[in-house]
Each structure stands twice: as structure tokens, then as C-alpha cells.
Amino acid sequence: LWVLLLWMSYLVLLLPLAILFVGSLKNWFLRLVGVGLLGTQYGPDSLLKISKNLPWLHSITSQGVIAAFALLILACFLGKEWGFHSNPNLKFIKSSNFQYSILIILLLFTFIDVFYNAFISYDKQIWTAFFRYSIDLQKKYVTIASFTSALEPGILEETERYLAIIILLAGFKRNRSWRVPIAIYGSALLFGLSHLGNSGWNGETFEATIAQVIGVMGSGFLWAILYLYSGKLWIPMIFHFLMDYLANLQSGWNSAGWQFNGWATDYISEVLMVLVPLAVTVWMMYGKRRKVLEENADRLMNLPVEFNRY
């Protein structure tokens, strides 16, 4: 019971201060800085002493899952305070511009991206960067920690993406031609840069960290465009969790997150990870696809939207 009470307290710990200080900010850059500072405040939850005799409760707390949910709750209140839609998940409204086939294509490319990132196993031979895969899921890594360490970034980092998207949409609302591209590519850039802190994590080299910063931007492009097209934050959360969980099941949750050997295939793989998702997002910027992105952007901003429904 006391653990649940502790969790309930932690979930709303920073809410008053966040609303008071960050909620009052009007400048988009200062809002990004404020959100970034709030994100760093949720690290101490790993120091909360929950007995290892309660393995699920211990892992959920120490791996930062509670912190992730706390930021998600905070994001809803901040969005409302800034005058935006308070729920990151928009109610589905099928306009004449929305196409199920486009959503299926986006889901397919996102799944391919997860599969490539999780299972590509190249060596120095050029062809292996395209066609060599290894699925090595190990039973010894099917642990609570592997699950919770993937769940935490799936929730927390996608919440941070949502906040970056709405902040950038609002910051560039006067230029409707550029607000959606800026929100998508800007949030992906911030997502990539957030991995700079991984340098040294369980032996990850600085070169590998730079490669990770660049490589994950590709996934960031897809997850951002998928969110704006579907209006559902839980969809990219699932894909983000799946990518990390598959990695954990192959090498353990506390292994180095990225490898870089300086081979030509390292660079080819990086290019594939970024350019393919980038091409998908560019394709989404035109026609009815773009109109759906704009409609959902307006809805997130609480701006009036005229839907032509079937």
C-alpha cells in the first residue's frame, strides 16, 4: 500500500511548479528548455527504495516507468495550460482526406524500421548492410528489467516528442506552410540529440553515440509523422517500446545501446536508417496526406477545423 501511495505522490510531484513556471511561458524556445529541465527532474525516482522482494514494483520504480507516466500526466496539464488540446490522443474523425491505405503504409514502414534496427547484422561486406539479419532472442533476457527498461523510453520519450511537436506547431503557427515540417523534423532532431548522454553507457563509445544520434532520427521522423497522421500517441509508443524490447531480448537491457566499427557498412546502415524514413515523411507532405497532418495539427492547437466527412 505504501508503494502505491508513494507512486501517487510522485505522479503529481512537479505538477504545481510546472504549471506555475513552465505553463506561463509564451516563447516556444523557452518552452522547449522548460520541458527539457522538467525531464531531468524525473531521474531521482530511480533512487526511491523499493525492496527487490517486490520485483515488479522495484523494477517499475527503479527503471523510471513511474517517472514516464508522471511526465505524461504533466504533458496533459501543460498542454491545457498553453491552450492546446489536453489529451495527446485525438478522437478519430474520418475526414474526406483521411485514407486507411496511407495509415497502413505508414504502419508497414514503421514496422520495417523496427525490424531493420532490431535485427540487422552486417559485417564488412557491403551486401550485409541490406540483407543480413539475425534474430537472436534469448530466454535469459526475458526479465522484468528488460520489459520495464523498454517501457520507460516508449512512454517518456514519446511524451517528450508530443510536447516538442505542440510547442513547435504553436511557435510557428503564423507560417502554416512550414509549421508541420518544422514540428516533425524538429522533434526528430531533438529526439536524436537526447541520446548524446548515452556516451560511455556500458562501454558505448563516443563514435557509436554520434552514430546513434543520427540513426535514431530516422525512427523519429516516422514516429512523428505517424502520430500527426493518426492522432494517436499510443501508436508510436508501442513501436518505440517494441524496438527497445527486441534489442533487450538479444543483448540485455544494460548493454551498450549502439555499436560502430568504422566500416563502410556502418555508414551505409546509417544512411538507410535515416534516408528511407526521410523519404516517407517528404512523401507525406503532399496531397491529401498533408491535409490530414494539417487538420490534426489544428486540432492539437484547439483551432477550428472544418471536416468534409463521408
Can you say where each PLM-predicted feature lies in the sequence?
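N-terminal, membrane-interfacial amphipathic/helix-forming hydrophobic leader that caps
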Residues: L1-F92, Y245-Y310
